[in-house]
């Protein structure tokens, strides 16, 4: 179990190199209520941002650096980012609760970051066109699809413009710093979750335009943006990481993720066991009995730590205990 925020994964090999994993959360050194994202840096220099959420201050956040690729699991506000952070996460007074200062991001935090960093956005199915429009709203020009080459569907970064990649079931892409050299393989895997944009949460016609927005709202319907996804990342040092996204327990955790990909590390999204996604009991079962990684990072707990330590009596503490740590 790795409950801390600044993480280095050391692959035990003759020529070992590290994959750096960092949380860009509401408050540095804490696991806060709205923290959803992780930033992965491969030894080759490829940098991948996972589910940006609302705890990054848009594309100008100084913690970002280069962002070559952004992964999005689904379009719920806390993952795509209907708001962005409006505080210094390093300040001693920085908030760590759901009321931490934020400002509206009408085209989503993800699109602001991609437009500023010329990132390649990897998503499942219908989400690519939805995200492309949000980036176009910011840049004023259409957002192209990302190029690919070779048997591994390779794409070289950094790029000079943002682009989108639409992966279907079983799809893979490889992101590399230099053409012909090894890179990070990104494979899409299923998730069981809702993937809708609620028109009632849209404060303007930017998120959903009329007449679609009005027609959906008048009929009490959300906009469905294709199926949600998870990912398996294979880094150049051999490390494989399973990103569950928001999901319930599913057979593919065993048949596809464990048996085929065999990840060493899993990042599992956990909640209080309500209707949204797995609670600590379900998540512990999924990790220990189905996925069987060597280490686990819990995410999405909606609970703040204190002084970087897990608060007793919380779902985070319950999950750790169930994992036998």
What are these regions (language model features)?
Residues 9-16:
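Sec/Tat signal peptide C-region and signal peptidase I cleavage site
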Residues 45-49, 53-122, 126-129, 137, ...:
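Active-site metal-binding motif and surrounding structural segment of the metallo-beta-lactamase
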């Amino acid at each position: 179990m790795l409950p801390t925020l600044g993480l280095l994964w050391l692959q035990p090999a003759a020529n070992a190199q590290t994959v750096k994993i960092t949380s860009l959360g509401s408050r540095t050194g804490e696991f806060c209520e709205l923290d959803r994202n992780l930033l992965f840096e491969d030894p080759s220099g490829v940098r991948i941002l996972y589910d940006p959420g609302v705890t990054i201050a848009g594309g100008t956040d100084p913690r970002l650096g280069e962002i070559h690729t952004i992964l999005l699991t689904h379009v719920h506000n806390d993952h795509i980012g209907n708001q962005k952070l409006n505080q210094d996460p390093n300040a001693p007074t920085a908030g760590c609760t759901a009321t931490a200062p934020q400002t509206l991001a009408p085209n989503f935090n993800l699109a602001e970051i991609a437009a500023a960093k010329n990132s390649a956005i990897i998503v499942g199915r219908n989400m690519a066109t939805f995200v492309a429009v949000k980036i176009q709203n910011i840049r004023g020009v259409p957002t192209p699809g990302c190029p690919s080459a070779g048997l591994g569907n390779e794409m070289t970064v950094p790029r000079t413009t943002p682009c989108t990649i639409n992966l279907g079931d079983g799809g893979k892409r490889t992101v590399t710093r230099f053409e012909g050299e090894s890179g990070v393989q990104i494979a899409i895997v299923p998730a069981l979750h809702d993937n809708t944009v609620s028109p009632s949460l849209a404060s303007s016609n930017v998120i959903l335009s009329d007449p679609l927005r009005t027609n959906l709202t008048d009929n009490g319907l959300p906009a469905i943006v294709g199926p949600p996804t998870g990912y398996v990342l294979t880094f150049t040092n051999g490390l494989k990481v399973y990103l569950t996204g928001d999901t319930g327990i599913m057979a593919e955790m065993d048949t596809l993720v464990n048996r085929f990909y065999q990840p060493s590390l899993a990042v599992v999204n956990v909640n209080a066991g309500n209707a949204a996604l797995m609670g600590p009991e379900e998540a512990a079962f999924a990790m220990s009995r189905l996925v069987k990684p060597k280490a686990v990072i819990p995410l999405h707990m909606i609970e703040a730590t204190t002084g970087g330590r897990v608060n007793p009596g919380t779902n985070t503490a319950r999950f750790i205990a169930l994992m036998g740590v």
